[in-house]
């Protein structure tokens, strides 16, 4: 795929029908031109991947707020888990602490196929995931383009 060049060496590489990888940006220090380019990429590709980021909880929230007001995280399963002082950060993890307790809201099981908060009267426009540890391969986080699915339906 051909990469699109945007402000200060920011590179948008489309990954196919859905998604793009954004390269050459530090989300903790992104300026207005980069944020605008990221928003335009999001509008076009729906799912964006930013590899190699090192964000604090404050950085994650500041970047997230460029896309609008934050919705409170849901309370599910083992209960909502947030870092102390960061109720808008929702920890999802399959890791258990030294006492055997899940450190994240979903315990150590896989989440079922779902759409984030689609049950809400006004669902959020997006979800932001920040992975601290990822497997070398696999990992079962997948995305589906409902726009592409609709375009491929027959008229019948």
Which positions does each model-derived feature cover?
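Non-heme Fe(II) oxygenase catalytic core, chiefly the N-lobe of the double-stranded beta-helix
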Residues: 1-156
């Amino acid at each position: 795929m051909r990469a699109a060049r945007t402000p200060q060496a920011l590179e948008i590489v489309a990954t196919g029908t859905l998604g793009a990888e954004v390269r050459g940006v530090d989300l903790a220090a992104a300026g207005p031109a980069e944020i605008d380019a990221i928003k335009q990429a999001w509008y076009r590709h729906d799912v964006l991947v930013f590899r190699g980021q090192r964000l604090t909880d404050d950085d994650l929230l500041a970047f997230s707020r460029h896309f609008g007001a934050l919705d409170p995280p849901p309370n599910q399963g083992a209960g909502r888990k947030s870092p102390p002082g960061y109720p808008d950060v929702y920890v999802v993890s399959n890791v258990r602490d030294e006492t055997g307790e899940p450190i994240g809201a979903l315990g150590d099981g896989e989440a079922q196929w779902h759409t984030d908060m689609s049950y809400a009267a006004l669902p959020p426009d997006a979800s932001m995931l920040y992975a601290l540890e990822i497997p070398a391969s696999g990992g079962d986080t997948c995305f589906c383009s409902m726009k592409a699915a609709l375009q491929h339906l027959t008229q019948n």
